[in-house]
Amino acid sequence: VPMSSRMPTILMLRMDEYHEKVIVNKDNIRIIGEARDRTVITNSGCAKDLDADGKEKGTFLSYTFLVTGNNVEVENLTIRNDAGDGSLVGQAVAVYAAGDRGVWRNVRMIAHQDTLFCGPTMPKVARDALPRLIPEGVTSVGDCPLTLNRQYFEDCYIQGDVDFIFGPYRCWFERCTLFMNKRGGLYTAANTPEQSPYGLVFHNCKLTGECAPGQAYLGRPWRAFARTVFLHCEMDEHVSPQGFQDWQGGAPVTERYAEYGTTGARADQSTRHPKQKRMTEADAAAYTIREVIGGYDNWHPQHRTPTWFLCGDSTMADYPANAAPMTGWGQALKRLVPENVFVENCAVCGRSSKSFVAEKRLNFVELCLRKGDKLFIQFGHNDEKPDVDRATDAHVTYPEYLGMYIDAARRQGAEPILLTPIARRRFDENGKLQHTHGEYPAVMRDLADYRGVRLLDMERASEKLLTALGSEGSKVLFNWQEHHLNYPDGVQDNTHLSDTGAVRMAQMALTLLEEAQ
């Protein structure tokens, strides 16, 4: 994973149970599990564990999953801390969200006391991860007030008992389920800084559990200026009729604690803590995602940058430095797209439309796809190969496999785009370019028309380019090297592109895409 990159790095986790502590200390990363309930990261660290000096490690080194990087998205997996009951082992954090602009979608977070902490790295933790601390004395960025780090949670399941969602950050929870363990306790414990107008906000969430009725409190203030608000949430009988609770011997509930539009068994707010705010409709309407976590950079986690996913073979794939100047045109495309587009090159050398599916690569791509994305599908070079793992029949199984990619994209609200394979550099003795892909390109053209899919006819466009350059002139587009550090004996490759050729093909794809609008 690069230390810094404009485009996110996507990490796919296969279904398994991973027993380890994870530290994500780099920016712009998407971590996606294959199946939420069966892709599990777990550990059993707890506050009472001893360090090398024989001292208790404390809460903030007990985590299973720590994120200090910014712009990190975690999706479709489970993160647990299996240390056990907090009355025996102390605090045991499952997720420690320390970065800024963190996004968590369809993630299960399961522990007991202190399941989810949203706050900066503490001094002990900084020895293990890059700290993201606010410099002392800083109160603004430019002309804007300082925005403390922000986290966004959507369709998550968060389970615990004592203060199990806590910390100082601004956080928005959308359609999340909060589940109280049998022990009972408090869903939240915010410690919002005095200068922050927002803390923990729960919108359209469900509060439930397995404790005795009335033994789950909405929260208590960890510090004097703590803020927690529940908007349009469903609360069942496990929730205490009192709602919030004072911190015994500490901070009391104030008007910074509020709720509005509650439904379910605890919809009646007449029995709530006397100091919590009774919100009006106008008060509640002022709480929006943009207002709460937008900040000085106007961040909105529901407005995402579209990604172009590339599925194909070696002519499209990325190559390491020791293969240079051989370059896939998908690799070159990343340099040419506008800043409002990301490119995720999933192409793999040697794959056909069939083998790419058989290796479950399409399954993972589908997990990543979102509405507004594009899926570029270019196969043919290896479908014509004779081996059983890759070969497809041009008129039967080839269009069937291509249809799987089209269906996967459309299921996720993404646009599928078919691309015929680029031409090989193969001229006859008379200098005439030869067709080398058989009937596969023609079948793809017919399929695009039948399924109503945009087609980029890279074969015809690249044939036109190679014909114009001629047998000798076209060598510059391919990996033809007499002497090169990576090819000391030289190489004459008429299929794979040089960096120059990759750029030309990527430019060609962009031109065809614009023409096909």
Stretches with model-predicted labels:
Residues S4-R304:
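Sequence-level preference for short, compositionally simple segments enriched
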Residues I10, E73, T307, D373-F376, ...:
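Structural motif
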Residues M15, P120, A347, F379, ...:
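A cross-domain feature marking catalytic cores of carbohydrate-active enzymes
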Residues R30, V40, F342-E344, E415, ...:
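Conserved beta-strand segments of alpha/beta enzyme cores
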Residues R38, T327-Q331, G438-A442:
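Short, surface-exposed alpha-helical segments at coil->helix boundaries
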Residues Q302-A347, N363-L375:
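Serine-esterase "nucleophile elbow" of acetyl-processing enzymes
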Residues A317-P325, A347-E359, K385-A394:
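Acidic/histidine-rich helix-loop elements
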Residues R361-V503, Q507-A516:
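Alpha-helical cap/lid subdomain in secreted, periplasmic
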